[in-house]
Amino acid sequence: MGRMRSLALLAALSWAVSAAAHLPAQALDYAPTLRLHASAPLRLFGIHVYDAELWVSGERYVPQQAHALSLRYRRAIDAARLVDTSIDEMRRLGAADETRLARWRQELARALPSVQADERIVGLHLPGCGAVFWHQGRLTAEIHDAELARHFFAIWLDERTRKPALRVRLLGEVAR
């Protein structure tokens, strides 16, 4: 009985370690209860752009609780394109102050480097505080701007997202 119990514990720990491998270890320092909630691919015009994972602090996604998005890119994308697309989407979702958007562009330029195929960017949203970003497990930016963080994560998680099917899959909702 002891051997079976040990094997079961080892299997559970192995799963936890492999799951956590998609998040930088430091992310758990900020939000120790993060767990993988759902994952889904993003395809544009049939091209596989990235695989997204949503990590949540509780049983489900709650916007006011810490959560992380992990994006494993399937193709190379230049940093300027990542930043420009993010700013364009934040503007589309209601961020209208161009002075603020210019400041946010500078912050995101620190956070979002160019990526190659199979590289990962992780963003951790700490509601009310800001966000932390990693590329390939290396810290790229700590952003102490709660509004920037809220608008950035809205790109994927807001009801008005440009990719509602991805949002539905990440949130584990039933499509309407």
Predicted regions and their residues:
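N-terminal signal peptide c-region/cleavage motif recognized by signal peptidases
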Residues: 14-20
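Bacterial N-terminal signal peptides that target proteins for export
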Residues: 1-8
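Terminal leader/tail segments of proteins
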Residues: 20-176
